[in-house]
Amino acid sequence: MRFLLQRTAFYLFTAWAAITLNFFIPRLVPGDPVQSLISRNQGRISADAIESLRVLFGLDANENVWEQYLHYWGQLLHGDLGLSFTFFPAPVSTVIGDSLPWTVGLVGITTIISFLVGTALGVGAGWRRGSWVDGLLPATTFLSSIPYFWLGLVAIAVFAGPGSFFPSSGGYEAGLVPAFDGYFIPSAIQHSILPAATILVSSMSGWILSMRNMMVTVSSEDYITVAHAKGLSERRVALSYAARNALLPNVSGFALSLGFIVGGTLLVEIVFSYPGLGYQLFQAVGAKDYPLMQGIFLIITISVLVANLLADVAYLLLDPRTRKS
């Protein structure tokens, strides 16, 4: 319990520091976002509304940065992320709420599948060295070295095109309304196949390689020799003794990968024009959309910290030495 309290206190401090940076960094970007907003909406927003917009977006010239910072925290504590410049007058929470399910559905599922399959293959490759799984490593390592966006472009060039089953862009067929029905769901799955395959191919090698190396290291430990001497089955020794201890570094890496689900596949979403949160972040940076950038960074920060806390809990469950310390 003391360990968890210490880690929780550390993560709370880290969250405060990250949110503080989240407030200041966008304000260091050159340019005036309010003027940019008026230019994009020329004819619909009066230039006389500049000061009102500055107050609305927390950029009041009559307030110093410290007052703006306190105002920002007040909004956060009330669950108010402000209004988006890019999608004005839509609230940031609405924009994020519309995009987050796409990213979690695509990247979350593919990350979990990649971890489970890669870890299982890594256990086999490390426990039975020289097997067919070992032969996969050079190919998977080569594919994982290719950048996400380049692999995505290759996938589009090879598998997408006129008359192809695989769409090259978008999250669903034009004209459909997002809903849980027999028209939208198959279309969404069809549009997610290529980006999901790109992420799987690029990320699986890391899990295989790290798990294989840990299995090789663990297999030479004394407790593995003792387990064999006790007459335990090969399967039980491999899974209950070797894999359980070799899994610890992968658990930490998996938690971090879950934390980076939101922003880690930005380029994949851009290449496939996928309506996820990474693509929204790209648009927000280009439009100097402070509130949307801050909202997305906040989601990324919280997801990373929560994922690390879950990794600490997993360590407590998997490694008795952590509980004793």
Predicted regions and their residues:
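Hydrophobic alpha-helical transmembrane segments of membrane transport/permease proteins
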Residues: 15-68, 163-184
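Alpha-helical transmembrane segments of integral membrane proteins
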Residues: 2, 100-133, 148, 176-325
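Residue-level recognition of pore/gate-forming positions within transmembrane alpha-helices
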Residues: 11, 43-44, 115, 141, ...
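Short hydrophobic helices that act as membrane-entry/anchoring signals
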Residues: 6, 67, 71-75, 79, ...
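N-terminal signal-anchor/signal peptide hydrophobic helix marking the start
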Residues: 5-11
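Membrane-water interface segments at the C-terminal ends of transmembrane alpha-helices
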Residues: 21-28, 71-74, 139-170, 198-204
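Hydrophobic alpha-helical transmembrane segments of multi-pass integral membrane proteins
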Residues: 16-21, 65, 69, 108-112, ...
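An internal, D/E-rich "acidic patch" concept
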Residues: 60-119
